[in-house]
């Protein structure tokens, strides 16, 4: 069966968007609020009608992820910030495979996310309550699968409990995107052998988004 590179690219952009947001949070203590909302909201939607629906039904919601994906795919340098993004992206893919192969882990994750949906009736998605709840899911369900993702940034920024919770919640969104990526036919070999195909697809999607003013 021919692979749907549109869906694969969207899901991959979802992983990369989380990686970029984690990087922004770790270095600056804040990140693109709209992109964060899209990524966190993707955790909640357990029964989406399409790949795009996971990210709010609009390609523009993945602009940060698509731009990051192009940077990761075409990185001529394995140093600095691009290296961080590549490391976060690949680490999320590795953890997703461990999650999918760990007995009962996906069921546990699903049950915990159902709990988030109940909390959303009383609290905003980006409230400290929801951030802490999502961070706790990451710590309880994902972290024990190992290896842990080493987040690098400003030590002063990373000491903040609020930033730590946001980083973990955003990593959980990255795991969600990685699960989706695998479901639509994604695989790590594509990063080596289908790089041009993924690059072309990402550029095509970005080309018909309205430019940011």
Curated annotation (Swiss-Prot):
Which top-rank group of organisms is this from? Bacteria
* Coiled-coil regions, chain positions: 79-126
Claim: Acetylation is one of the keywords in the record: no
Question: Key word Signal present in the record?
Answer: no
Q: Which InterPro entries match?
A: HflD, HflD-like_sf
Record keywords, A-Z: Cell inner membrane, Cell membrane, Coiled coil, Cytoplasm, Membrane
How does the record classify its membrane topology?
A: Peripheral membrane protein
Could you tell me which HAMAP family the record lists for this protein?
HflD_protein (MF_00695)
Identify the NCBIfam families for this entry.
Answer: PRK00218.1-1, PRK00218.1-2, PRK00218.1-4, PRK00218.1-5
Protein name per the record: High frequency lysogenization protein HflD homolog
Q: Which organism is it from?
A: Shigella flexneri
Q: Which gene encodes it?
A: hflD
């Amino acid at each position: 069966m021919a692979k749907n590179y549109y869906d694969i690219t969207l899901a991959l952009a979802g992983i990369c968007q989380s990686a970029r947001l984690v990087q922004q949070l770790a270095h600056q203590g804040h990140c693109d609020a709209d992109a964060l909302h899209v990524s966190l909201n993707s955790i909640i939607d357990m029964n989406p009608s399409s790949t795009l629906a996971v990210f709010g039904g609009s390609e523009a919601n993945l602009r940060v992820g698509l731009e990051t994906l192009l940077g990761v795919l075409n990185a001529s340098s394995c140093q600095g910030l691009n290296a961080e993004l590549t490391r976060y992206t690949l680490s999320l893919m590795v953890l997703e495979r461990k999650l999918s192969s760990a007995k009962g882990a996906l069921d546990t994750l699903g049950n915990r996310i159902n709990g988030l949906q109940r909390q959303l009736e009383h609290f905003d998605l980006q409230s400290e309550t929801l951030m802490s709840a999502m961070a706790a899911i990451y710590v309880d369900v994902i972290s024990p699968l190992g290896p842990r993702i080493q987040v690098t940034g400003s030590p002063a920024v990373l000491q903040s409990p609020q930033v730590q919770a946001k980083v973990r919640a955003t990593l959980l969104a990255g795991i969600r995107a990685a699960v989706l990526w695998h479901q639509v036919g994604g695989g790590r070999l594509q990063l080596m052998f289908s790089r041009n195909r993924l690059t072309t697809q990402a550029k095509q999607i970005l080309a018909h988004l309205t430019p940011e003013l």
